[in-house]
Amino acid sequence: IVIDGKALRAATEKIKDKKAPYILNAMDAATNLVIAQIPIPEKTNEMTAIPKLLEILDITGSTVTIDAIGATETIMRMREEKKGDFVQQIKKNCPATYQEIQNIFEGLEEEKAADPKTFAKENTERYSEYSSCERNRERVEYREVKCYTNDYAIRKIREELPFICSVASSCQVRIPREKDADGNDVTPDKETFLKQGSRKCPKPTEGDKLTDQIQKVGLVSNHTLTAEEIARYKRDHWRIENCLHHVLDEDFLEDKCTARKSRNVLSVLRKTAYNIIRLMQIDAREDREFVIDVIDEITEDFSAALKWIFDPIPSFY
């Protein structure tokens, strides 16, 4: 379950210093279905709304991911008490925990470099690494995750968060794609980019912000996981941006809707329509002709909506 907030920018009241209203969404990453939403009250933020959203969800046996704003003891403990698992990003907004994670993995790197064989033997079941490379039209992304599950090593973190079982360090390098005059790909490799940058990005920045080319974050979980599993959960967290928020703005024009008093109701209606389409896509295995036939059937007889929209929902759970 992925939880993230989304702004309704066009619904902002035309008053000086008035902030855009926000909706907090919860999405099932396996099916891309929206399972809950609550409006974020004015003069508050996601941090106060997240516990209210968690309260109405049954997260038993589910893994809940939230961006860095969910890295508070209260929100992590609530997920633990509701019998859910979590993979939580830790950024510099939690300086003590962030630095402790960095210290743990810097120490592990020193041990590994000093005596690789002994390190591998002693940490076979506790330490894992995972790396991947993804290419798209705009950039090449290298991702590396290291995970450690040694109780003694993470004892300082467990003093405050006793339910933590795994800690991880993630490094993501984003390199802008480049082509020469003939259209050939001349994007530098990871090592070259880290040493001297590139033509488009001569001085790569490092940090935990989306604008940084080199992003480093920590992660913690109340479940014993491998580096590959944590990397997958971290990657899946972005599905809510790509599969839900982008679709709401581009296809449903949510970001251009100026309705104010009815904005929350309209948001529910948009997500109901979104879920209808997602359910039909799942059932049809993305067969476009099938989707058109179903829409025609529902138009002629709305009771058909029960068969295609509501009856299949329990089968996913």
What are these regions (language model features)?
Residues 76-84, 106:
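Short, surface-exposed basic-aromatic patches at helix termini and helix-loop junctions that form
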Residues 85-90:
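Short hydrophobic alpha-helical runs that function as membrane-insertion/retention elements
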